[in-house]
Amino acid sequence: MQSTKTKTKHFSFLLLITLGVMTAFGPLTIDMYVPSLPKVQGDFGSTTSEIQLTLSFTMIGLALGQFIFGPLSDAFGRKRIAVSILIIFILVSGLSMFVDQLPLFLTLRFIQGLTGGGVIVIAKASAGDKFSGNALAKFLASLMVVNGIITILAPLAGGLALSVATW
């Protein structure tokens, strides 16, 4: 039989991985996408400035998503809101693969950012729900390490994905 301390460590590790992946959704929408910018530009037949707007729209969405979904998760529950926005994120990401008009693509990138920002704020709020004081500080530091590793690997993953498939 596992001790309480072992169960707590196992729970904390699973929570760290889960929330680490959640906090990485926002940066992943940018970092995995960057290697494909020249290909996206060619496919849309757009200027460099127009394609750079896809990053701007995503960043604006990331910022606004935190302001929108933080209070919503406080009011309606973290899990309900997180699951809803993850579903939206996945659907929007799938739709963006089939879009051939830049204005619609910009809209989808904004929604990706919005939902990515929502997941980030919910992940951090969830950590605050589970921990406090020094334990929270240690957990958030570990969360940032996971997020940092994912952020470093994302452009590599994006480049690799681009080498075997299209954007």
Model-assigned labels for residue ranges:
Residues 108-146:
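Cytoplasmic helix-loop-helix junction between adjacent transmembrane helices
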Residues 23, 55, 59, 140-148:
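Small-residue-rich transmembrane alpha-helices and their cytosolic helix-loop interfaces
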Residues 31, 59-67, 151-152:
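Residue-level signature of mid-helix packing/kink "hotspots" within the transmembrane helices
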Residues 36-63:
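Extracellular/periplasmic helix-loop-helix junction of adjacent transmembrane segments
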